[in-house]
């Protein structure tokens, strides 16, 4: 089960705990208090996506890599001996500096399907709760989750809205990568759109990027030392990787296999 699958399984148990409380107290007030408690325990849920602060692209010498049916450039050398592919959908790219990139491929609508399975709700009810477009793609559902904050659950909210928004706040708090504490940024390329969790200016130990297309998503985790002589990974270097991602057509993959 993927990380999001495990996350959503936790959410499935919320309903029973809420039912007893609701017998004695008002719905909206209870959910407003609960949402603010989540915000106090997990301050990251108060963050929402903003535009990327640096769109420059590193021009440093590097390499073009090809894994899992995709190719992209990195502005660094690669340690081929330590680079490993632990499964059919992920690869760990080792860099001579000691840093690494975890690259993985995600099937279409994995997040949406996990939500439907874990919440035990049917698609029609979720569409009524969150809107027609919410379950259209993993990108649209992720965007919905990231845009919600505890402040959107008010004491005078309609019961259905309060329940739905609180559920999103809880999902957001549990699913958020550690890097998201320093910022959440929108990502756009020619073929993908998604989000970056983490501001490289704060030199986090890890920084995640998720990008989505109609035929599935890609995830990059940039891992680095948080101190020492190795230069920190910069936004321009991350942009070099993300902005050069492209899917390799099947015909091209076949042709490469013949050479």
Where do the language-model regions lie?
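N-terminal targeting sequences that direct proteins away from the cytosol to non-cytosolic compartments
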Residues: 2-115, 122-123, 204, 215-216, ...
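Signature of long, low-cysteine stretches enriched in small and polar/charged residues
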Residues: 128-215
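Surface-exposed acidic loop/strand-edge motifs in secreted or periplasmic proteins
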Residues: 87, 92-162
């Amino acid at each position: 089960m993927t990380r999001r699958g495990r996350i959503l399984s936790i959410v499935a148990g919320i309903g029973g705990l809420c039912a007893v409380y609701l017998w004695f107290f008002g719905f909206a007030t209870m959910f407003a208090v609960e949402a603010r408690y989540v915000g106090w325990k997990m301050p990251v849920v108060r963050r929402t996506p903003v535009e990327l602060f640096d769109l420059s692209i590193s021009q440093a010498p590097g390499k073009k890599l090809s894994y899992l049916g995709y190719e992209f450039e990195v502005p660094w050398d690669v340690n081929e001996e330590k680079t490993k592919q632990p499964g059919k959908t992920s690869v760990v790219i080792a860099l001579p500096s000691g840093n690494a990139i975890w690259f993985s491929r995600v099937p279409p609508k994995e997040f949406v399907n996990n939500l439907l399975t874990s919440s035990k709700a049917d698609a029609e009810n979720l569409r009524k709760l969150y809107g027609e477009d919410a379950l259209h793609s993993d990108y649209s559902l992720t965007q919905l989750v990231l845009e919600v904050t505890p402040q959107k659950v008010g004491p005078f909210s309609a019961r259905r809205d309060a329940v739905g928004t609180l559920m999103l706040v809880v999902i957001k708090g549990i699913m958020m990568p550690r890097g998201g504490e320093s910022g959440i940024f929108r990502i756009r390329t020619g073929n993908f759109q998604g989000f970056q969790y983490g501001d490289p200016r704060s030199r986090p130990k890890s920084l995640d990027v998720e990008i989505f297309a109609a035929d599935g998503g890609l995830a990059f985790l940039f891992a680095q030392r948080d101190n020492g002589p190795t230069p920190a990974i910069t936004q321009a270097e991350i942009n070099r990787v993300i902005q050069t991602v492209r899917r390799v057509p099947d015909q091209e993959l076949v042709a490469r296999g013949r050479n």
